[in-house]
Every structure is written in structure tokens, then in C-alpha cells.
Amino acid sequence: MPWIQVKLNATSENAELISDMLVEETGALSVTFLDAKDTPIFEPLPGETRLWGETDIVALYDAETDMDLVITQLKASAVLDDNFAYKIEQLEDKDWEREWMDNFHPMKFGERLWICPSWREIPEPDAINVMLDPGLAFGTGTHATTALCLEWLESIDLTGKTVIDFGCGSGILAIAAIKLGAAKVVGIDIDPQAITASKDNATRNGVAEQLTLFLPQDQPENLVADVVVANILAAPLRELSSIITAHVKPGGALAMSGVLDTQANNVASYYSDNFTLDAIAEQQEWCRISGIKK
């Protein structure tokens, strides 16, 4: 059915108050926060909900809603200024599931690696194909950090190697490593949902026997590999640098992403004593740090 959308501008200080008011007083069915100024926010503290300095609030209503009454209620609210700006838009009825699926296409990384959603035809059946559908909020190859790691894995010889995917998420990097020739891969993640997602995706790709998955507290001691890839964030890459370094065999390779260009040199400094680092690779505002352990 069709919907009515109302967009308001807010600040980080009053956005949640406005959201509560839209739901409780005007009957909004959903409320979404959007960045009004294209300003990234990363690494909130545990339990913290960060919002942008200028935040757009988008509220969704049933098409039968009396929007004149909604606007009257908004104007009477103490949360909003008297002269607040708003935009009302009628949303056409669509097959939203089909619309969502249409946005995902097979993606190629390097010369031979493809990530393909299950509902799409495989472009190159003889290439290395990882079947992976979006879900569970974990990587599917669309983000620059995942792409940087996939391109790196595709560029090195993994034949017969052992690999650790540190922060495995969906398992996309671990599965790609196996399909690229790795003999055995270990995936580690703090989130039990990630372990479940990785296991399911590995089974779907026929590589479950080569993938072992651990929560950090369950992993064996002295776990090392020829290749380690860690697509997480700058803060844990700094805080866990000694642990990540210890996972790499002497002469082994390490690649890390989840790092902004403004953070890359600082993160690299935590590894430069133990690794001969490559030039930092960049895609959009994201970076990959890689090197060989001394």
C-alpha cells in the first residue's frame, strides 16, 4: 500500500525527543535518522547512540493519515521551533523486496573473484564465485573495506596456506580465501551471530569443512597462520595489535581495513616494528594496511 513520508531537520540534541514525539503523539509507524551533512560517525562507545550534528528525521505514516492534523500537532509541540521546516511526500506502492533485491549485483574483485547474490546469474561460471546474500548486517562486498580486503586476498598466492579471518562477520573473506586455494581458514568474531552467519555461508558455498570458527574466548592458544586479514575498525586494530601480530607467522602476510584515511598512519605505527609494510591502499575514504612479518 502507499505511504506518506515526512522529513524534518533536527540536531543531535533534540533528534531522539522528536522521534519519540512523532511515534507517541502523531502515530508515525516508523522513524529513521539520516545524516543531513554527509558527516561520518564511527566507533560509538558501548551503549552510546551517536547522531550527526544535523540530522534529518524521516517519519512514515499510513496513506490515510490526516497530515494536516499531524502538522498541527508538530507545531504545538514544545520540542520543535515554531518555524521548523518540513517536507511531505507521497510514496508510491512498490514491491519493496524486489526493489531491494534489484540493488544487488554480482561484483568482481581482481582478475578472478566474484561475489554473487543467489538470485543473480553467475557472470563467469569458470571463475572463483562466492555466493553470498545480504543479511545479518555483515559484509557482502559492497563496502570499500571489504572490497579492499577481497582484492588483496585475490592478489596473493593462497594455495595450501592457513588463513585467519580476524573479525569474520559474514565469513565473506574466509570463504573467499578457501575458494582462492587456502587449505584451512579460521574465523574469529566476538558476535555469536557472526559465527552463525559464517557457518551458514560456508555451508552454502561447500567449504564448511575447511572453515573453523571461534569466539575469542574459545580459540586455541598460540593460534598462528600464514595469512591474517582483519577488517574491523581503527580502535580495535590499535588495542589488539599485539594479539593480531602474534597470529601471523614469521614471514607471513597481514592485511587490515576498517580504517579511514585520517587514521591509517596512526594504525600503521602500531605494526611497523614487526612488519615490513606496503604502501597504504585507498578506496574512497577507506584504507588497507598490509605487510609481511619480519
Curated annotation (Swiss-Prot):
- Which domain of life does the UniProt lineage start with? Bacteria
Write down the chemical reaction(s) this protein catalyses.
L-lysyl-[protein] + 3 S-adenosyl-L-methionine = N(6),N(6),N(6)-trimethyl-L-lysyl-[protein] + 3 S-adenosyl-L-homocysteine + 3 H(+)
EC primary class: transferase
Q: Which GO terms describe its biological process?
A: methylation
A GO cellular component annotated for this chain's UniProt record is: cytosol
Keywords, comma-separated and alphabetical:
Cytoplasm, Methyltransferase, S-adenosyl-L-methionine, Transferase
EC number(s) reported in the record: 2.1.1.-
> Pfam families given for it?
PrmA (PF06325)
Q: Which residues are S-adenosyl-L-methionine-binding?
A: 146, 167, 189, 231
GO molecular function term, any single one: protein-lysine N-methyltransferase activity
Q: Is Kinase among the key words of this record?
A: no
* Location in the cell: Cytoplasm
Q: What does this protein do?
A: Methylates ribosomal protein L11.
Query: Which HAMAP family does its entry note?
Result: Methyltr_PrmA
**Family statement:** Belongs to the methyltransferase superfamily. PrmA family.
NCBIfam families named in the record: prmA
Q: What is this protein called?
A: Ribosomal protein L11 methyltransferase
Task: State the organism of origin.
Answer: Aliivibrio salmonicida (strain LFI1238)
